Design a protein with these regions (language model features):
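Alpha-helical solenoid repeat scaffolds of the TPR/TPR-like class and their adjacent stem/linker regions
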Residues: 1-203
């Protein structure tokens, strides 16, 4: 029904970029990625500065395994809005599952590390980020496929964790408090946070 409604809206006003973008979102949810690509491409053709459509197009290219195209979409947004946190985040966390060679792995690892530095720099120099902007960025992607490189990721994961901590402290300062060392003999409780608890094939 959503597809039908948006297609009718496109017929009524084919030059409204937002409708094409929304139709693309529906097609993406349905797993019809090529149709989603066509919708997003039409949206940015109508409005070249439509940052959400560029980001959405990049996300679909990622699903299709076209990682360089995805990164190009995020770079376009950064050209339009240099401080766009979501695009920097998406670009940083874009990894192939399988690499052509070891050199390509090195390039993506450097991109990831450079991405953490860039976002830290944005946090140092920009104070306008809202809670929604930070949450939208962090939930847009993760570094899940970093582990597929088969390297020692401790250093990179520490930098990523420090960045996550810094971002969450900005929006949830009440949860960032010094904790006293537990000297009792009780078991330490460890919490896990993961989107897979909600959306996963085995849940």
């Amino acid at each position: 029904k959503a597809v039908s409604c948006y297609e009718k809206a496109v017929q009524i006003n084919p030059n409204f970029a937002g409708t094409h973008n929304n139709l693309g979102l529906v097609f993406k949810e349905l797993g019809k990625f090529q149709k989603a690509v066509s919708c997003y491409e039409k949206a940015v053709q109508i409005n070249p500065n439509f940052v959400d459509a560029h980001n959405n197009l990049g996300a679909v290219y990622f699903e299709l395994g076209e990682h360089q195209r995805a990164i190009s979409c995020y770079k376009k947004v950064i050209q339009i809005e240099p401080n766009n946190l979501t695009s920097h985040w998406l670009s940083m966390n874009t990894f192939p599952i399988i690499y052509e060679n070891l050199k390509e792995i090195d390039l993506y690892r450097k991109r990831f590390e450079d991405g953490t530095k860039k976002i830290n720099h944005l946090l140092d120099t920009q104070s306008q980020y809202t809670k929604k902007q930070i949450v939208d960025a962090m939930k847009s992607s993760t570094n899940f496929y970093l582990s597929y490189q088969g390297r020692n990721d401790i250093n990179l994961q520490q930098k990523y964790a420090n960045l996550i901590e810094r971002l969450t402290e900005k929006i949830y300062p009440q949860f960032h408090q010094e904790r006293t060392i537990n000297k009792s003999k009780k078991f330490i409780k460890i919490g896990f946070v993961s989107s897979f608890f909600k959306n996963h094939t085995i849940s």
